[in-house]
C-alpha cells in the first residue's frame, strides 16, 4: 500500500509543483507599463537586488531595508554581499516576441539617472526584440520605449520550488522502487526516515479526521502539501545560500489555499451545501443572518490558511534578521566594542531561534495539513440520524 501511495504522492506533488511555479511567477509579474516613469510594481522583490548596507546619506545601516532585502523575492540568489548567482529574465513583448537573458546583464546607467550604489537604476537590452528594460529598485521593471511586456522571469522563490520539486520527486520515486524491490521487508536508508512521516500524515491526520473510507482520496494531496511546506521551510533555514523564503511568499500560499478551497468545494456533498445555505434547526428569520456569515466563512477559511502560513514563516526570518541588525546598529552608534558584545548576544539568541524555527518548519506544515483535512472532512461528512 505504501508503494502505491508513494507513487500517487509523487504524481500529485509534480502537478502541485507546476501550479505553484506558475503562481509564483505571476505574483508581482504583471503586464509592463507603457512608459518608464509610470513603472508598475511587477517585481515585489526587486528591491532585494541592491545592498542595504550601502543605504543612507553617509552609508548608514538601515535595518528595514536589510530585512526586506533578505526576505523579499529577487531575480538573483545572493550568497554573500559581493557574490550572487543570476537567474533567467524572461520577457514577452507584445508584437515582438520573447527576450531571454540572465539578470546579470542589467548594468548601472550611471550619471544618466543620477543614482549610484544601492539605488542605481540599471538597464539591459533584450537580445531578440531590442527592447531596453529599466530596472528601478523602487518601481520595478519597465521599458524605456514604452513597449508593453509580460515579465515571467525565474525568481529566487521559483528556483527554490523547482529545486524542491525535483528533489522530492526523485526521492519519492526512489522510495517507491525500494518497496517494489524489497516487498515485506523493513525500510532502510532514507526510506526509513520518510516512512514514519508518511504514516503520520495518514494515521494521525487523514484517517482520524476524514475517515478510513474517504482518507485515501485526499491523502496524495495532504502528503504533497505536508512535504512541500516542510521542504520549503527547511530550505529557508539553511544560511548563506540566498535566503529562500518560499512559504513566506504570498503567491505560493495563495495557490496552496486556493487548491484547498477548490478541493473542498468540488467534493462538498448535499449535506455540506445544505448546512451552508439552509442550516437545519435555525429559525427562518435567523437564517437571513446565519447564511451570509456561513458563506463568508467559506471564503474566509482559505484566506486565514494562507495568511497564517505566510505570516508565521516570515515572522521567524524577521526576528532573526532583526537581531543581526542590532549588531550593525550598535557598532555604528556605540562603537566596535558594543557591536562585538551585541554580536555575542545576538549569536546565542539566533542559535536558539534556529532551533525554534526548525520546530516551526514542521509545525506549520502539520497545522496547514491538519486544517485542510478538517475542511475536507466537513465537506464530505454524511448526515447523522
Q: How would you describe each model-predicted region?
A:
Residues 2-5, 21-188:
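Perimembrane topogenic segments of multi-pass inner/organellar membrane proteins
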Residues 5, 185-189, 210-219:
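Membrane-interfacial loop-to-helix junctions in multi-pass inner-membrane proteins
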Residues 10-20:
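Bacterial N-terminal signal peptides
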Residues 144-149, 201-215:
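Cytosolic juxtamembrane amphipathic/interface segments immediately preceding
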Residues 158-163, 245-257, 261:
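Selective recognition of hydrophobic, aromatic-rich stretches within alpha-helical transmembrane segments
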Residues 170-209, 271:
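Hydrophobic transmembrane alpha-helix segments characteristic of membrane transport
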Residues 219, 224-238, 251-363, 368-370, ...:
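Hydrophobic alpha-helical transmembrane segments and adjacent short intramembrane/lumenal linkers
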Residues 239-244:
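Membrane-interface helix caps and helix-loop-helix hairpins in membrane proteins
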